[in-house]
Amino acid sequence: MDHTDEYIKEISEKIDSKKEYYVEISNKIWEFAEPRFQEYRSSELLQHVLKQAGFSIKADLAGEKTAFIAEYGSGKPVIAFLGEFDALPGLSQKADAAERIPANPGSCGHGCGHQLIGTGTLASAIALKDFVKEHNLQGTIRYYGCPAEENAGGKAFLVRDGYFNDCDLALCWHPEQGRRACYGSTKANFRVFFTFHGTPAHASMCPELGRSALDAVELMDVGVNYMREHMIDEARIHYAITDTGGDAPNVVQSRAQVLYAIRAPKITQVKELYNRVCNIARGAALMTETTVEIRQVAAYSNLISSKILADHMNAYLEKLGPITYTEEEYAYAQKFQQSLSDQDKNQLPTIARDYFGPKAAEVMKKPIFEPMAYQNLYSDLKYSTDVGDVSWLVPTVHLNIPTFAAGTALHSWQAVAQGKSSIAHKGMLYAAKIMALTAIDFLQKPELVNKAREELTKTLNGETYPNPLPKDLKPEIW
């Protein structure tokens, strides 16, 4: 007998009945806006809520003070919900303001919706816990409090230290332009500091005695830019000069530093590019008679999506139907669409085609993309996520739900500004329902868990997880 409609009603009621509570939690995390590995208040709040809901807590994991696992139940399957809560530096923004108004200039802001991710997965885990208890089901529900997704890859440290070894499924979600569970991958990624050390000297009186670390940084950047012609099209390399050596031009800079992000579709390709970039850095040091210190601080593996999990999620997306919005919410979204740059506005048709194909023109008539986004489900994504590291060990699904005006770029002030809106909260609670309903299918049918594991084994085709972190690397605030 099919109980799908009953379960949809039950899970929806469990989540909707606590709507104001979850909105308050999300808004508090938005206000905390704490950077990577410093999400102390956000982590404490989430732990408190889960403990109150009947979960046991293990905290301070893998050298990450703000990481934790909340657990309920026992036995198999072990279902992991991946929560995030770190904010982005320099993106502070006044809520609901459709113009650039930093709330606290220079501070962090939630430009990637992690306050929604952390709270939405929490709501889903609690609803599933209540369902399991009431229906007397066996299984273990875990909420993973995952810090530092941005720039530091916090999950990779948790994976390396074995915290996912006994998991059977992993569910997560992310704000995006359309409703869908994708089958595609994300880019693998290394984050590496190159610090050059030279010799200071008076730049006019005795420049011949100086050896410029800043020259080395600039030569390295030029060398990498020439390398771009000779790497695969799908690769991306970005850099930020984090230390120019000071602000005195009459002193030869004795220290300078640059941070590189190296991306490619597969971790093996990233390693190859990394070795080439390191050689360019050594060459720059040789040319300038400086020395270079190379320090990798983070790594992200490419995502391996579970089609079986995604199929179940997409079926529930169809069953639940589109999120409904009010005229006031459409007007709110329209206001933010108008705030976009001309370049961003010109990208809207392309975004709509990527998500909705031939339906793009019709979908664009509203300022929030509503239908199922079936176009390009197999397309690989341009960004990186440390969910990828989990996915090499555990069948994993990555759900996308809209939480902002169509065309809003992630990591933008517009994304921060809309983070406390009713549009954002509707998307968050909708995602919570989809994840809980998907988990119920796999709790009740062990054969689905086995199929998901078999699918992952087949996809890997003999490959083993190439843990990209150096063995001695510890999480650090940088």
Residues covered by each model-derived region:
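Histidine/acidic-residue-rich, glycine-tolerant segments that coordinate divalent metal ions
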Residues: 66, 88, 97-109, 115-116, ...
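Conserved short loop/turn motifs at secondary-structure junctions
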Residues: 34-35, 144-148, 297-302
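Divalent metal-coordination and catalytic microenvironments
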Residues: 29, 70, 81, 114, ...
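General structural feature for long, well-ordered alpha-helical segments within catalytic domains
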Residues: 7, 18-25, 38-49, 77, ...
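Metal-dependent amide/peptide-bond hydrolase catalytic core
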Residues: 218-478
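A short small-residue
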Residues: 5-6, 24-28, 99-107, 196-204, ...
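Acidic/His- and Gly-rich active-site-bordering loop/insert found
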Residues: 2-110, 115, 119-140
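Non-cysteine beta-strand/loop elements that form the S-adenosyl-L-methionine
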Residues: 80-82, 91, 197, 399-402
